[in-house]
Regions:
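A structural signal for alpha-helix termini and helix-coil/disorder junctions
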Residues: 26-30, 220, 278
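Conserved active-site-adjacent core of cysteine acyl-enzyme catalytic domains
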Residues: 2-28, 34-160
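Noncatalytic regulatory segments and standalone regulatory/sensor domains
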Residues: 128-223
Length: 296
């Protein structure tokens, strides 16, 4: 394994679909471009696994919106792409962005253990396929760290979709935007779910996604020069994510989970509106001088 050549990318605040899009954004447009992936802070739950709501968007939607935010355009887009199809695409493009099942990715700790949508980059190499993945996370099976690996093409998973990403000229930085639904129904769904272990496992993933999204949004606002008083709020989100993981481990052992987890989630989701409120842009006042004139 070799390190990913994108040191400007803040991998620790990106999810597994965003992070490799971020690598290409900075590679094509320069350091910091990837932070525009955080321009739109959303809380819009949709139906998810185990009858629980999720904030995890469909990967294809996430790619298309994210690419537009950072000034990239998906080209040669294809669904259900086997390894030989990825190879054919890579022979026509500098690099291929793909999303597949993490269970089938030999470079990840999830390989053979956990199913989830996960992105990677693939290119040609004299020894086969060069895989690049900037995912950065601690998992139950060990750390996942950014890197490059070389595999025979047949070792690559079938992608649910794959494409090339082309730079868009004259791209303008997106303005910050919020779209935050009322959190009551979301929190109640986790509170009332009859399978406490399933709820605890899902909530661990949800808080991880929610926390990274808020860190990314704050980083983008600061990148634009805005002074955002969000440090303590973000620390509370970090603590909530850690508490959710502890709650999952306790639930797996048949032990009671911390009682304040869901009330704190509700409190933080409610506070997002004020902490991340987009204030109207106020241009600096223009100083004018008035010249005195004599009356005739």
């Amino acid at each position: 394994m070799t390190a990913v050549a994108a040191p400007s990318v803040r991998t620790g605040i990106l999810d597994c679909v965003q992070v490799n899009l971020a690598v290409l954004a900075d590679r094509r447009h320069g350091p910091g471009r990837h932070l525009a992936l955080g321009a739109k802070l959303r809380f819009r739950p949709r139906p998810g696994p185990d009858g629980l709501p999720t904030v995890d968007p469909p990967p294809e939607d996430q790619l298309r919106e994210g690419a537009a935010l950072v000034g990239l355009r998906p080209d040669a887009f294809a669904r259900r792409v086997p390894a030989d199809g990825l190879r054919a695409l890579a022979e026509r493009a500098p690099v291929v962005y793909a999303v597949a099942d993490s269970y089938d990715m030999p470079w990840l700790p999830y390989a053979g253990r956990a199913h989830m949508d996960h992105s990677f980059l693939a290119g040609t190499h004299p020894d086969g396929a060069e895989v690049e993945d900037a995912y950065d996370n601690e998992t139950a099976w060990g750390p996942a760290r950014p890197g490059r690996w070389t595999y025979p093409w047949e070792r690559l998973p079938t992608a649910s979709f794959a494409c090339a990403l082309t730079p868009v000229p004259a791209h303008r930085a997106p303005r910050p935007e919020l779209s935050l639904d009322d959190p009551a129904a979301y929190v109640e769904a986790y509170t009332a779910h009859p399978d406490r272990l399933a709820a605890a496992r899902r909530l661990t993933a949800e808080t991880w996604l929610l926390t990274r999204a808020r860190h990314l949004h704050a980083a983008y606002r600061e990148h634009l020069g805005e002074r955002l008083d969000a440090a303590e709020h973000l620390r509370r989100w970090d603590r909530l994510t850690a508490t959710a993981f502890i709650a999952q481990r306790r639930a797996e052992r048949g032990r009671p989970v911390p009682g304040g987890l869901l009330p704190e989630l509700a409190s933080l989701l409610t506070a997002d509106r004020e902490v991340f409120a987009v204030r109207p842009h106020r241009p600096r006042p223009i100083r004018t001088t008035t010249q005195a004139t004599e009356k005739p």
